[in-house]
Structures are given as C-alpha cells and as structure tokens.
Amino acid sequence: MYRAASYNPFNESVFLRTWTEDGQRIDTEMPFRPYLYLEKDGAEDAVSIFKTSLMKKTFKNSLERKKFVDNTANKRIFHNLGPEQQFLIDMYKDQNNDPKFSQFPLKVFLLDIEVDTTAEPGFPVPERAAVPINLITIYDTLTKSTHTWGLKEQYTPTLPDCIYHRCKNEQELILQFVDFWKSDYPDIASGWNSSGFDFPYIINRFMRIFGEDFVKQLSPVGNVRGRKVFTDMGKEVTVWNISGVSLIDYMDLYKAFSPGEKESFSLNYISEIELGEGKVAYNAVSLGELAQTDWKLFVDYNIQDVHLLVKLEDKLKFLEIARMIAYKGCTNFEAALGKVAVVTGAVAIQAHKQGMVIPTFPNNLDREAFEGGFVRDPERGIQKAIVSFDVNSLYPNTIITLNISPETKLGKVIQGDFENLANDPKGEITIRLLNDKIHTLSGEKFKEFLIKEKVALTKAGVLYSQKSKGILPNLIDQIYKERVEAKDRMSALKKELSQIEKVIKSKENRA
C-alpha cells in the first residue's frame, strides 16, 4: 500500500509515500541499503532458481553496488534490482495481491498549460521554453476541484468547483502554482502529450525564470532530474523525473491500453470517439490570437482540455490500470508503461513465494543471441479436412501446460527426428543437458525417459521438467485466473445493469 518510493543514496534511506491504516496520507523516511546475491558453496542466505547456494551482499549505497557490479565480470548476480523496487518488494511482496492494497484513492493532478505563441514565431520548443506560460489548469481528483492560473483579466468560471487565480505576471503565476503544488503533493501528474510538451516546458521555463534550485520544489524530496533519450523518430529529447511524483503521459496510456489502430492520437479526435465531445472550437487563426482577442474563450479552451482528461479517466480508468500493473511488480507508477521493471518484479515476487531468487545479469556480461519463437512451416498444396482452432490465450496456456520456466529447463534435443517417434521408435535422439553432457538414446528409450522423469518436450525440442510447477507458469496461471474472474464479474454486472435499465424503462412507460 504505497504511493511512491524515492531512494536517496547519500543518506541511505527511502522516502516512502503511503497511508495509515485508516487512510490518512503520510510520508515517512526509512533506512535502506541496496543488496544483491552471489553464488557461494555452502552459503545459507538464499537459494537461486538454479538450486545453487547464495550469499547476500549489502552495500552502503547504490553507487557502491553499481561499482561492484561493473567490476564483476562473467559472474551470475541475483536480485540486483533498482533500490526503490527492491525496497518495495521487501516491504510489500506478501501484500500486493490483496484487494485492500489499493483501497485508498490516489491524488492525481490532470493538467494542461498554454503559452504565449505570439511572443515568438513557430511552435514553442519545450527544451528552450522561450515564451511565457500564460495559463495553467489543474484538476485535483481527490478534492474534485479545478484550479486555473491566468495572466489576464478576471475570469468567471462556469463550472462548479472551479477557481480562477488572476496573476499580475508570469512570475506570480509560477509562484502561486508551485505553492499550490507543494501544499499537498500529487501522487501522479498527467496530461495529454504531457511528457512531450507540458512537463518539459514547465520544468525548463521554471528553471529559466527562477533557476534549478527553485524547480526542486516540485519534488517532495527535492530531486528533479532529466535524462536524454531518443524518440522513435530519432529525435533526442529530455525525459524528466520528479522523485515522489509519478509523471504519466495520458496519451501514452491510451496508446498502450486501448486496442486497435487510430486515425489520430490528438486529444480532440480521441475524446470525440470516446466521449462524443471535443475541444472548444474557436475562429481565431491561432491560440495566441485567441488569447489576445477573447480571453474568456481561451480559458474555456484550456479548462475543457483538462476536463476531457477527467472524463476519459472516469470512463477508461487507465490510471487505475497503471496503478494495478505497477503493484504487480512493486514499482513506482510510471514504470507501468514499460515492461521490464514490472515483469521482473512480479517474477522476483513469485520466485520468493517458491523459496528462490532470480538472476539479474550485469550489463557487461557477454550474452548470446536468443533464438526466436518456434513457428512451424506451412505445408504447400491443397489440403483436405482442414480444421481451424481458436485456442483461448494460446501462449500463456502453452507456458502453463509445458511448465516453461528458466528453472525447469533441462536441456534440448540437438539431433534426431523427435517428432516422428511413433513411426520410428528405433531412431536415435541426441540431447544436450544444461550441464553440457550429451546423451544419445534410441527413440524407445527417449520416450521412456520423458514419461519416467516427467519431462515435457516442446515443438522446438526443448525439455522441461514437470515435477514441480515453475515460477513463470505459476505467475501466469495466477494472473490468468484473476483475468477470468474479472471477466465473469464484468459479465454479471452487465446483466445486472441490463435488468436495472429494463426496470427503469418499464417505470417510465407506466408514467
């Protein structure tokens, strides 16, 4: 039950944002030292998925651990996770599947900014943040209130629980906004294309006006940092992180969680198809001209953009989905849009439940290329008696059925027609086990081996033990069952809703 975790390597602690048992929002600092496991004969700290003995090694901070890992060549390292995730797993690995774990609501700021596009030709560049911010709107999901800060004349809100803050200049707007932000820090801040525009523009503009130290106030632990990444189009951009507050782009959420191709990912198009309403229409040439000629409509435009996000989240619950995904792997919420951290965390937790620790290989380890998934070649020609099967969740159920998991893998067939054992029982099969020992068996002996030792044979010729359920099959089975239960509940609720609608319609007809 957490809202965020921020690790500080300099004071060896984690700043944890959580709740009390009765739902009060609290922040607390807890001592924490990162660690990892190493293989050592006779060690008793833990057991790896390979059944080897492990020794726990603790470090003063993450910098010391990284230096150790960088200097450790060609050695298997275990449970070398990020400090925040390691801390969260230690704290919550036995609770994260409990429905009560997510019982308290998060404080989400849905936001949108406008800038003075008349001050400079062309579209404003977030990295430069050269023109003033003239409008910011935030919707607070916890208080159900809207706050707008603007530079021009007074504005009378038409929406309930909407407060307009008139500011004399941009400096006052920024100061008031930051005071509001830090009066009760959000758990998540989100907007449409906010990682591409709003967040970088806010941070760079604030730094330009007040300096780097001022921007640190956006974080409850005073830590705001950026890192350079390349977009799919090859453009270098800065992705910002505010420790203690998850920055999540709602457009990225929509792309990740909404099925099917879309003609456009503009907020106007998506809100039209999802909600049946779009952005505020205007006749001005640009938003810059609109701000100069009709300030009220300009503010309406900005507020409507935020309230479209509110309505999208009310309908789609994508931020709630991101929260549930993050809890599965004990990560901070922004990691839900990735794959590695959540999956690694979920597997590490499942391994712990089965009394094992997973490997996390150092970056400098030489890695061999992975062979792609098995695809059977089609047989050309006219076929008779064709049957088409639609298998429910084929890949997950294949993993469960064959017990495919790193620790259950025994070896692989390297020679022989193992698919034709029934027709050629005397043919020879050669297998290589994980210890690199090679055995050649007759087809008949190979079949006996599979049955006696409870071994599953995949179409790619890989051998998996069936003696005990693997980590991945266990995890997938659990998630699959939860999915089935959720779909059953949805089906029951739809039937219940249909009955309610019939009753209402019947009463309306009688009236």
Place the predicted regions along the sequence by residue.
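Active-site-proximal helix-loop-helix substrate-binding element of RNase H-like nuclease domains
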Residues: T146-L151, T156-Y164, K168, Y185, ...
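Non-catalytic nucleic-acid-binding interfaces of large nucleic-acid enzymes and RNP effectors
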Residues: M1-E84, R208-N241, G276, V280-A281, ...
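Short helix/loop capping segments that flank catalytic or ligand/cofactor-binding pockets
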Residues: T118-P121, H147, F199-P200, A256-S258, ...
